[in-house]
Amino acid sequence: MSKDFDIRHSNAGNIFLGVLAIATIRDFIEISLKGRELIDPLNPSNSLKTYFLHFNSFYFLVFVSLSLILYFFARKKTCISECFKIGALAMALIWLGPLFDYFAFGHFDMTYPSDPLFVVCNLHHFVDPNFSYEGLSKGMRLEIILAGLGGMGYIYYKTKKIIRSVCGGICLSATCLAIGLLIPFITQYYEYGLNFGYHKLYNSTLLHQGFVVHGAGCKIALFYIFLCIILFSLAYYIRSHNRFFAIIRNMRWTRSLHYLVLFGAGIMFIYHNPPIPNPSLADYYDYLATIWNHPIDLFGIFMASVAIFLSFQSAVIFNDIYDYGIDEVSNADRPLVTKAISQSEYRLIGRSFAILALTIAFCIHETFFFFVLLYQMMAFLYSAPPFRLRNYFIASNLELAIIFLVTLHAGTTVLIPEYRFENVPHHITFGFIICYALALVVKDFKDYEGDKKSNVHTLYTLFGIKIGNFATAILVCCATLLTPLLLHLSQLIVFSGIVCILFLLAITFVEKRNIKEMTVTSLYFIYVLTIFYFLIFQQQGTYIDYH
């Protein structure tokens, strides 16, 4: 029997769902023993985020950390997959803490240690039942000790080395404690320097500044999710170097950058073009003033960008799955074509990226979650049968243009969730869609052979390479010349004319596919960045009006 995950039976997915189930049961035990309402009727969304995202992301971080430590100390006698299975089973220990505290002492109250430095300086009392730490109950200490003992036993069973086993057990317990102390250390050091003491964690300015992420618990969850992404990536690299690098190479980095540029442009647009004051919304504008007078939450914006990036990567994976026949002819280096990864495992990774992107988006706020979900649904219509709009170049170009617009609007909602789609002038919205829909025909050149074999309708498959190149050049030139007119950027008409000529030369006379793609892509980024610069910085305060 293989030591690795049998992806065909979804063992990897079952393990992660099992850990999620264990963590959710722990949430329910905690809520029940505290005597609180399951969902606060006054703020149901925040309750759900706190229990399902904040706490569960913490437990996932513990799970992946412990699994990697087990592998590190027993790696010569085990595999990363087995360590993840053992780690998942060991997570059942998290039920013990609240139950032990409640039945042994009659109460349970889980919180973060109020003075992390005090805990570190008094670790020699950790196993002393008569010594107390604020925010670190005896049940939680019991969980940490049992995790270390269990890990010690597993490492000894695999290696038969006592010193290695003891070191592994100590490292496991220390890691559990360190994860619990990490956020208190970061927030208190940020706000009070080395003056540690009793401070309210959830009142820390670090967890509230910038107003991108609404709620301290959500920002903590994002921090844990970020660490989980790093550690899960490390685990997948350990599991298979070849598969890991096959996915990295296939991430379409240029197109990823394109989506991040659109997303960043949306953020910059709303930041430099704040809503026009309206006396009837005085309280709301006090809120806006608070945003603009505080430091920008760079971590929140970074994680929002990660959500956009992961959404695109999920779309790439599913597009590769449905484009397998085309890629066999036109893109022989794709992971599925080279057999670097199985389709079932590739599909599982795509689903994981999509779920992770939605989770991050929900941590930020519901409006951003909606735009990320909308992005993923439109990407599904583009790639998946029976709709598969990708087969029809007019429909596919129009949908991709709308997806680009959705990405731009996702950026505008990050700073202001209440931002209304209809308040962007129609000439910008329709100009954006029309210009991209015309220009996107250029993407079909590189897949000509595969599209022709699979009966995909593009300008190239309908009219051939020569006429297709000419028609593509004309449409791209039209898009380039229309852009300053539709967006009311008359100062860029001459610049657009120059770029138009360069596009025409690159598309018509450059024959090698790689050189043509690189040239057109470089011209595109130069042109788009110039357009966004003038749109954002040269016409401030002219577009957005709330009434």
Model-derived features with residue positions:
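Multi-pass alpha-helical membrane architecture of UbiA-family
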Residues: 2-547
